[in-house]
C-alpha cells in the first residue's frame, strides 16, 4: 500500500493540463446553447402557445394543460436536433443532491417499428417511487407512489444526450418530498407580502422577485491521491492526517496565480456552465491550498438554486476529466479553512429596482430602510430557524472556527446604516431618511484614480451581513442545497412583512398619515430587533456571552438545533404563509436526524476500518523494526552502551505502544457506543446519542493516529499525507 502512495504522487507530478478549446470567441455566442430559453421557445412553439407559456413564467399563471402537447413537441424537435435521445424529470430530493430517471423518446409505431414520441403528459407529470427517497415516514414501501411535476419557471436544458426537465417532487398525498416545492411556495409568499408593502411607495409595481447570488467554494485533489485515501472516498473528508508544516499561514494562496491544471479545469467548467445558461463570472484561488471559488451573476432565486445544483454536478464530472476529484465537503482538511457557499440575497421589483439598495430621494430611502428593518426583524425572530436551515453533520465542522461565521446568527450593518437606524430609533419626529453616497479616497499616487469607498466595510465574522445592496448569508455550507436557507429566509421575511403591513394599516385606519405610520412601525421594529445587530468580532468569547444575554440561539449541538423547525413559532410561520405543513416539517426533521446519524455512523465505520487495516499494522511493523534494532545493538555493544544508544528507540517503542493501545481501546468503545445508539428508536434521540457519544471519539482517536503519523517511517506510511493532498496540483 505504501508503494501505491508514492506511485500516485509521482504520477500526479507528471500530469499535464488538459487542452480545452473554446466553442466560440465570445461567451455570448454560446451562452445558453443547451437551454430551451425564450429564444428557442419563440422559434419552436406556436405564437399563442409561446404567449401562454411566458405568462406562466413571468406572472405565475396556472399552466394550461391544453398547451402541454404543443410545448412538448417543440422541446422534442429542438432536443432531437441536438442529438438528444432521452428525457428525464430532474428534481431535488431531501438527499441534498439531484435525482433523475432517463426514458428514451421511443414508442411502438404499431407496425413493428419505433418512432420518437414525447407528449405533454410526459412533460407535465411523471410517477416515481416516493418511498425510495428520504421522506420522514410520509411514504412507505406499501404506499410508495410519488409524482414529479414540471416547473415551467426554470428552463429545460440538455446534458449529454438527455433532455432535463426541472420538476417538483411530491407524495401521492400531496406533501412535498423535495426542496423545490416549498421554495416556490416561499418565493410566492414573499412576492405577495413584499408587493403589498411596496404599494405604499409605488402602486404600479406588479411583482417582487427574490434574488440569489451564490459563491461556491471547493477543493480539488488529484484523483490518484483521492483514491488512495479511503476516508476521502467514502466520507468526503479526511478523518486523520497531521497538518502539513506549511498550510495557509503565509497567506499566499488567496487570489494567487491559478495552477495550470486547475486553470484548465476552470475553463472547461465555465464553458459548460455558460452553455447551460449559468452566468458564471468569477473564479479565483481561495485561502486554503488547493481551495478555489466560482461565482455567477445573481439570478432569480429558484433559477439560481437550480443552477447551483447543476454546477455542483458539472464540477464532479469535469474534475474527473482533468484527473481531479472535487471536494464539496465543508471541512475536508483539518487545520485549514473549510468551504462555504455565501448566499447573497435581495429583493427587487420586476422593473429592476433593488429594494435593499439606498435611493436618491427621502421616500426611496424610507422604502430601503423599511425592507432592511423588516429583514432584520425576520432574522431576529427566527434566528434559531435560520441556523437550523444551514446546519448539518458536515457544516458543523466549519462553523464557529476562526475561518467561518460563528454558529450564532447576527447581522452586521456597517457604520453608516447603523447610525441611520440609531437616529430613527431615538428621533421623536417623522423626518424622512437621508443617506450619503459613496465617498472618495485619494491615494496620492499619480497613476491611480480616486477610489469610491462603499458605505459599509466588511465584517467577515458576521453570518448575515449587509453589503451595500443585499444581505450576505455566509453560514450555508459548500455541499448544501441553497434552497434550505432560502426557504427559511424568504418565508420569515414574508411573515414579517405581513405583520408590518397589518400594523401600518391599523395606524392609517386611525387617521395617521401613511408616511408617519410607516416610520412609527419601522421605529418600533428597530427597537425590537436591536439584539440581532452586532458589528463586532463574532469569533470572540465575549460575543458568545453577550449573544446569550440578548436571547439569541447559542445552541451548538446539531441534532438539537434542528428542533427549531418544530417550535410553535416556526410551524405557525410556515403554515400561515402556506409554505409547509406541520406534517411536512416533522417529516423533514426526521430526515435531518436520520441523515446526521448515518453520516457520523459511516465516519465511525470508516475510521475503525482504517485504524485496524492501515494505521495499527504499519505502526506495529515500524515498532518491530525498532525492537529488532534494539536487540541487535545489544549484540554489538556492552549492555550499558546499548542501553544508552537505544534509549531514544526504546522511548519511541513505548510511545507507539501507548498510542496503538489507546486507539484499539477507543475503537472498541466507539463500536459499543454505536451499538447502544442504534438500539434507540427515536430518530432525534439516536442522532443526539451519536452526537454526544460517537462523534467525540472520532477526534480522540484521530489525535493518536496523527501522533503516529509523525513517528512512523515516512516510507512505510500507506496513506497520502496532507502535504501531498494539498500541494500536489
What does each of the following model-derived ranges do?
Residues 14-120, 124-140:
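Histidine/acidic residue-rich metal-binding segments in metalloenzymes
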Residues 2-24, 132, 141-155, 162:
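N-terminal hydrophobic targeting/anchoring segments and the immediately downstream early-domain regions
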Residues 524-729:
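C-terminal amphipathic alpha-helical interaction region
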Residues 67, 91, 119, 296-298, ...:
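Active-site proximal loops enriched in glycine and acidic residues that flank catalytic Cys/His/Asp
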Residues 143-328, 337-340, 347-590:
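Glycine-rich, acidic/polar active-site loops that bind/position phosphate-bearing ligands
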Residues 2-45, 200, 207-225, 230, ...:
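Active-site-facing alpha/beta catalytic cores
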Residues 67-71, 91-93, 121-122, 169, ...:
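Active-site-proximal loop/turn and secondary-structure-junction residues that shape catalytic pockets
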Residues 96-113, 128-131, 229, 236-238, ...:
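Short linear, low-complexity motifs centered on an aromatic residue
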Amino acid at each position: 500500500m505504501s508503494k501505491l502512495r508514492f506511485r500516485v504522487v509521482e504520477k500526479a507530478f507528471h500530469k499535464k493540463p488538459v487542452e480545452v478549446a473554446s466553442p466560440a470567441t465570445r461567451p455570448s455566442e454560446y451562452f445558453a446553447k443547451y437551454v430551451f430559453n425564450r429564444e428557442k421557445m419563440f422559434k419552436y412553439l406556436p405564437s399563442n402557445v409561446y404567449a401562454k407559456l411566458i405568462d406562466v413564467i413571468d406572472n405565475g399563471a396556472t399552466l394550461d394543460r391544453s398547451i402541454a402537447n404543443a410545448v412538448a413537441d417543440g422541446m422534442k424537435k429542438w432536443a432531437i436536433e441536438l442529438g438528444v435521445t432521452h428525457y428525464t424529470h430532474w428534481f431535488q430530493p431531501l438527499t441534498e443532491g439531484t435525482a433523475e430517471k432517463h426514458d428514451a423518446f421511443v414508442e411502438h409505431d404499431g407496425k413493428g417499428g419505433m418512432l420518437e414520441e414525447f407528449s405533454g403528459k410526459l412533460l407535465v407529470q411523471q410517477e416515481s417511487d416516493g418511498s425510495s427517497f428520504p421522506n420522514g415516514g410520509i411514504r412507505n414501501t406499501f404506499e410508495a407512489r410519488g409524482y414529479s411535476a414540471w416547473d415551467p419557471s426554470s428552463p429545460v436544458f440538455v446534458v449529454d444526450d438527455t433532455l432535463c426537465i426541472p420538476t417538483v417532487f411530491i407524495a401521492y398525498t400531496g406533501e412535498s418530498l423535495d426542496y423545490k416545492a416549498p421554495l416556490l411556495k416561499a418565493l410566492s409568499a414573499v412576492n405577495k407580502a413584499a408587493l403589498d408593502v411596496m404599494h405604499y411607495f409605488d402602486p404600479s409595481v406588479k411583482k417582487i422577485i427574490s434574488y440569489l447570488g451564490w459563491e461556491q467554494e471547493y477543493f480539488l485533489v488529484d484523483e490518484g491521491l483521492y483514491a488512495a485515501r479511503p476516508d476521502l472516498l467514502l466520507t468526503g473528508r479526511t478523518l486523520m492526517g497531521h497538518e502539513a508544516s506549511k498550510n495557509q499561514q503565509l497567506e499566499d494562496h488567496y487570489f494567487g496565480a491559478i495552477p495550470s491544471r486547475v486553470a484548465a479545469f476552470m475553463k472547461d467548467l465555465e464553458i459548460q456552465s455558460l452553455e447551460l445558461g449559468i452566468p458564471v463570472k468569477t473564479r479565483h484561488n481561495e485561502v486554503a491550498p488547493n481551495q478555489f471559488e466560482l461565482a455567477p451573476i445573481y439570478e432569480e432565486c429558484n433559477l439560481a438554486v437550480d443552477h447551483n445544483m447543476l454546477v455542483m454536478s458539472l464540477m464532479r464530472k469535469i474534475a474527473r476529466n482533468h484527473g481531479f476529484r472535487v471536494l464539496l465537503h465543508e471541512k475536508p482538511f483539518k487545520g485549514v479553512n473549510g468551504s462555504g457557499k455565501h448566499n447573497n440575497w435581495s429583493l427587487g421589483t420586476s422593473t429592476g429596482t433593488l429594494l435593499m439598495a439606498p435611493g436618491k430621494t427621502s421616500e426611496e430611502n424610507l422604502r430601503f430602510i423599511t425592507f432592511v428593518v423588516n429583514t432584520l426583524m425576520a432574522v431576529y425572530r427566527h434566528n434559531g430557524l435560520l441556523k437550523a436551515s444551514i446546519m448539518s453533520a458536515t457544516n458543523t465542522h466549519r462553523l464557529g472556527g476562526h475561518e467561518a461565521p460563528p454558529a450564532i446568527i447576527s447581522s452586521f450593518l456597517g457604520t453608516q446604516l447603523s447610525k441611520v437606524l440609531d437616529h430613527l430609533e431615538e428621533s421623536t419626529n417623522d423626518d424622512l431618511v437621508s443617506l450619503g453616497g459613496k465617498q472618495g479616497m485619494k491615494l496620492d499616487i499619480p497613476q491611480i484614480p480616486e477610489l469610491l469607498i462603499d458605505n459599509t466595510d466588511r465584517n467577515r465574522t458576521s453570518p448575515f451581513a449587509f453589503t451595500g445592496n443585499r444581505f450576505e448569508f455566509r453560514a450555508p455550507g459548500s455541499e448544501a442545497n441553497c434552497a434550505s436557507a432560502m426557504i427559511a429566509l424568504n418565508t420569515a421575511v414574508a411573515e414579517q412583512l405581513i405583520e408590518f403591513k397589518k400594523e401600518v394599516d391599523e395606524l392609517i385606519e386611525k387617521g395617521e398619515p401613511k408616511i408617519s405610520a410607516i416610520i412609527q412601525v419601522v421605529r418600533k421594529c428597530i427597537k425590537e430587533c436591536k439584539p440581532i445587530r452586532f458589528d463586532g468580532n463574532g469569533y470572540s468569547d465575549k460575543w458568545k456571552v453577550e449573544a446569550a444575554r440578548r436571547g439569541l440561539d447559542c445552541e451548538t449541538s446539531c441534532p438539537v438545533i434542528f428542533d427549531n423547525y418544530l417550535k410553535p413559532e416556526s410551524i405557525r410561520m410556515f403554515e400561515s404563509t402556506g409554505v409547509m405543513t406541520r406534517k411536512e416539517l416533522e417529516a423533514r426533521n426526521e430526515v435531518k436526524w436520520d441523515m446526521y446519524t448515518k453520516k457520523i455512523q459511516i465516519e465511525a465505520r470508516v475510521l475503525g476500518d482504517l485504524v485496524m487495516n492501515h494505521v495499527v499494522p504499519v505502526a506495529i511493523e515500524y515498532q518491530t523494526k525498532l525492537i529488532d534494532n534494539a536487540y541487535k545493538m545489544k549484540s554489538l555493544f556492552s549492555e550499558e552502551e546499548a542501553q544508552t544508544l537505544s534509549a531514544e528507540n526504546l522511548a519511541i517503542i513505548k510511545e507507539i505502544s501507548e498510542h496503538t493501545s489507546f486507539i484499539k481501546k477507543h475503537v472498541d468503545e466507539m463500536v459499543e457506543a454505536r451499538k447502544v445508539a442504534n438500539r434507540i428508536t427515536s430518530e432525534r434521540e439516536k442522532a443526539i446519542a451519536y452526537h454526544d457519544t460517537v462523534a467525540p471519539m472520532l477526534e480522540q482517536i484521530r489525535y493518536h493516529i496523527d501522533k503516529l503519523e509523525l513517528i512512523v517511517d515516512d516510507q512505510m506510511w500507506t496513506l497520502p499525507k496532507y502535504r501531498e493532498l494539498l500541494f500536489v496540483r
